Amino acid sequence: MAKRKVRRPVAQIYGSAINLEGCEVACLHPEAIRPVLGRSLSRDGSVTVAALFGVLADPSRARILHLLAITDDLCVCDIALVLGMSVSALSHQLRFLRERGFVTRRKVGRMAYYRLDDDHLRRLVLDGAAHAAEVVA
C-alpha cells in the first residue's frame, strides 16, 4: 500500500503565500515574523555575505585586514615586516584583496601603500578581533 503524501496548507500572510510543505507542524507565529517580513537577507545578498566571510576565513588575509583596520595606510614592506610575511606572499594576498575591492592601493614612485577604505569592513574586522580576544581570554 502506497503511503499517502500529506499536503500541507499554503498560508497567506500579508498577501504572501508561504508553502508549508515539509513542516512538521503547520503553525505560524505572526507576531514573531511580522517585524522581519521583507527584511531578511536576499539570496543575492547571502552570496555576497558568504563571499565576504570567505575572504576573512583565511588567517593571512584576516591579519592583513586587521592591520589595515588599525592604521591609515601602510607600504608593502612595512606590512610584511609587522606581519612577518615575505613580500611575495603579502603581495599575492594584497592583489587578491584589491581585486575584490577590500583594499585600495596608492602608488608613490616605486612605493605602494595599501589602505582599508570601507568603514563597514573596518568595523567587521575590528569586531571580529575583539570577539576573538574574548574567546581566547
Whereabouts are the PLM-identified features?
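Beta-hairpin "wing" of winged helix-turn-helix
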Residues: R98-V108, R115
